[in-house]
């Protein structure tokens, strides 16, 4: 069989231990299965083998399409005639069946993926929201989004990037809400990529799609590990990009205001959510400018405005009680936000550093 000979020459059968070639007989015809060990469901393969062993010579149809319809008891089945597609499917974990006398290949998607359970992300926690998060398996991530939007306008287009890795990429959007010009721009940028592989998954894709200028520190994408946040952005007309082997979604377009938003802002009443947004914006600004401004005022005390004179190192000054409460409330909110968004692996070293800094300041 020419097809089997070509597959044996192209694939490293016998060299790669996980690349399996299984020769069987179906209806008194020679047949060969190609698949990757570790990707195949054993139960599904047993059912397929039982079905194949029961096919008689008289029951063999003339074409591969008819055989797939009559004798392949599985849902995801395709008939391929292009060898590039066959090789790509085999290396992706799909089981490919060649039968003597058929010019086409029968691709049976019996894949199963090693994946961790769905759990809440460490750095994007919510007080009142759902407790699920994206994982490294792309089909699980699309299912989490489909569960929340049961609408025919939700489109998920599959493509790939990387000449060697051939990493799966899914472009998600609402066809009745998305900006068509933005969508066309995103598709053209992904299709025009000429890279060997996505070493760092989404970060590599982001850098390849939009070349960042050195003088612009702001990101082009917003990343989230929460399906509810991604779905909310879809309903706003934005585009979501999912990359296989990455537990987060890329959101675009984005702005500076999107970076300070969190899921908690929408799980509380409007007034509370607005307060959280304003507090986060103030804390973000203070994080960037408070240290240099404080140093500037300490070196030039005459520049301190009258309303902030209590910050200067002088004798005892009575700070207005209302101002004390406002500063205390803002500090508590800042600590709460830091506790919610700090990964568990960084919480201990940051606590030690904070204790040393506060102790040195007190002394």
Residue ranges of predicted features:
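Transmembrane alpha-helical segments that form the functional core of multipass membrane systems
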Residues: 255-363
């Amino acid at each position: 069989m020419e097809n089997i000979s070509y597959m044996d020459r192209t694939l490293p059968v016998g060299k790669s231990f996980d690349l399996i070639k299984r020769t069987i007989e179906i209806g008194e015809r020679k047949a060969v299965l190609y698949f990757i060990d570790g990707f195949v469901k054993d139960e599904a393969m047993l059912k397929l083998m039982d079905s194949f062993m029961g096919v008689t010579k008289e029951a063999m149809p003339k074409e591969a399409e008819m055989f797939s319809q009559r004798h392949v008891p599985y849902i995801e089945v395709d008939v391929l005639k292009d060898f590039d597609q066959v090789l790509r499917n085999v290396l992706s974990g799909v089981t490919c069946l060649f039968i003597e006398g058929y010019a086409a290949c029968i691709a049976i998607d019996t894949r199963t993926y090693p994946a961790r359970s769905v759990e809440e992300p460490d750095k994007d926690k919510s007080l009142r929201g759902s407790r699920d998060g994206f994982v490294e398996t792309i089909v699980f991530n699309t299912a989490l989004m489909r569960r929340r939007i049961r609408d025919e306008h939700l489109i998920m287009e599959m493509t790939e990037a990387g000449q060697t890795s051939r990493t799966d990429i899914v472009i998600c959007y609402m066809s009745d809400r998305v900006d068509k010009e933005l969508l066309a721009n995103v598709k053209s940028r992904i299709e025009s990529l000429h890279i060997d592989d996505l070493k760092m998954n989404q970060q590599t894709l982001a850098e390849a799609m939009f070349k960042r200028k050195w003088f612009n520190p702001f990101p082009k994408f917003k990343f989230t590990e929460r399906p509810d946040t991604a779905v909310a952005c879809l309903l706003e007309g934005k585009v979501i990009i999912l990359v296989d082997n990455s537990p987060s979604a890329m959101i675009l377009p984005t702005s500076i205001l999107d970076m300070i938003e969190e899921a908690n802002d929408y799980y509380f009443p409007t007034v509370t959510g607005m307060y959280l947004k304003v507090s986060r914006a103030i804390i973000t600004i203070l994080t960037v400018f408070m240290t240099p401004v404080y140093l500037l005022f300490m070196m030039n005390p005459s520049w301190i405005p009258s309303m902030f004179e209590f910050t200067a190192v002088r004798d005892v000054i009575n700070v207005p009680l209302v101002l004390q409460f406002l500063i205390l409330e803002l500090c508590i909110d800042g600590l709460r936000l830091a506790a919610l968004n700090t990964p568990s692996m960084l919480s201990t070293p940051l606590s030690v550093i904070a204790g040393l800094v506060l102790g040195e300041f007190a002394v």
